[in-house]
Regions:
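N-terminal core-binding DNA-recognition domain of tyrosine recombinases/integrases
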Residues: 22-120, 136-142
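Short, charged phosphate-coordinating catalytic segments
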Residues: 90-98, 157-182, 268-270
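DNA breakage-rejoining catalytic core of tyrosine-based enzymes
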Residues: 114-135, 193-205, 219-225
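Catalytic-site neighborhood detector that most strongly recognizes the C-terminal catalytic loop/helix
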Residues: 192, 275-310
Length: 315
């Protein structure tokens, strides 16, 4: 007598999927994602196929778990790989109309890790760190155009607190539009933001002439900042941080904006909105509303006197 699949325990059950199904799912999953996210999805997909060869069973799921825990020590890495596998099992459950696929995710749970709660970040950034990077740029042998692009990128990140990935997607048209408005407020579109939040970014007066120079003569669809080249330059020409043993990275400038904002009293909802940070609660999505002129006024009230570009500035 033939045993119905649902009558089998997971210990005995074996299911199949094709490499084509996995490729199609991966392609759909990685559409319009950042390079870093795509890299992790590709890595997880490779691990899944190499370990299972199209067979879903208790043994292959355990093999994925053991391989991942042995080769990756970071709790976040486990989550990314296991999360992809679980989502693919859910996909197979829906497309093949067989709930047994999803049942196998019980074998790929992350081990419980007790995390220490850090009350303070150990990475402290100050205006001196940004100034030192500016000095390093000014004394470099870079061509003028490249030097100006890197300098403007550095100051834009420091004065706005935007994510590097967001800044990398900004177009000449967006910046030109912001420069013609009163007040000068740039709109980041939802598809440019990590958490898909359309938000306003006030442009500090220090940035205005730099952005005008950077966008002059360029096409509307061009990207504004050469962030990849700047990241490579910083790697090859490291800038030592003043308060900790470490080198400046572009992502540090978001921390600088956060820490400097706390120092000068810019620590309300406007700051979080500008940074697109901590804004996913129901209170935010349902009740908060921001007008560009109000966001700009509050920002300038606090940040207006901060002149990082001036080596003699007390700020």
């Amino acid at each position: 007598m033939e045993i119905e699949p649902n009558a089998l325990s997971l210990n005995e059950l074996q299911l199949q999927y094709s490499h084509k199904e996995l490729e199609q799912y991966l392609k759909a999953k990685t559409t319009q994602l950042s390079e870093k996210s795509v890299l992790w999805f590709n890595k997880a997909s490779t691990i899944l196929w190499d370990t299972t060869q199209g067979i879903i069973s208790k043994d292959t799921m355990n093999a994925i778990r053991e391989y991942t825990l042995s080769n990756y020590k970071c709790h976040d890495s486990w989550g990314k790989i296991f999360g992809f596998v679980k989502s693919f099992l859910t996909h197979l459950t829906r497309t093949r109309m067989n709930s047994n696929y999803q049942s196998f995710d019980v074998y790929i749970e992350k081990p419980r890790v007790r995390k220490e709660i850090k009350l303070l970040t150990s990475r402290i950034l100050t205006s001196d760190d940004v100034k030192n990077a500016l000095i390093s740029l000014e004394s470099s042998n870079l061509p003028r155009e490249k030097k100006q692009n890197f300098k403007t990128t550095l100051l834009f990140l420091a004065y706005t607190g935007q994510r590097v990935i967001t800044v990398s997607r900004l177009t000449v048209k967006q910046v030109k539009d912001a420069l013609t408005k009163t007040p000068n407020v740039l709109t980041v579109e939802a598809n440019q933001d990590k958490i898909r939040l359309q938000h306003y970014v006030p442009l500090h007066p220090v940035l205005i002439p730099l952005l005008k120079d950077l966008t002059e003569g360029k096409q509307d669809g061009d990207l504004v900042f050469c962030y990849n080249e700047f990241m490579r330059w910083l790697f090859q020409n490291p800038v030592q941080l003043t308060n900790i043993d470490g080198k400046l990275q572009l992502k540090d400038l978001r921390k600088f904006f956060e820490q400097k904002s706390d120092e000068i009293g810019f620590n309300d909802a406007n700051k979080n909105f500008i940074m697109s940070h901590g804004v996913s609660s129901i209170n935010w999505t349902s009740y908060k509303q921001f007008l560009p002129e109000n966001v700009y006024k509050r920002y300038i009230d606090c940040w207006g006197s901060v002149d990082i570009n001036n080596s003699n500035s007390p700020n």
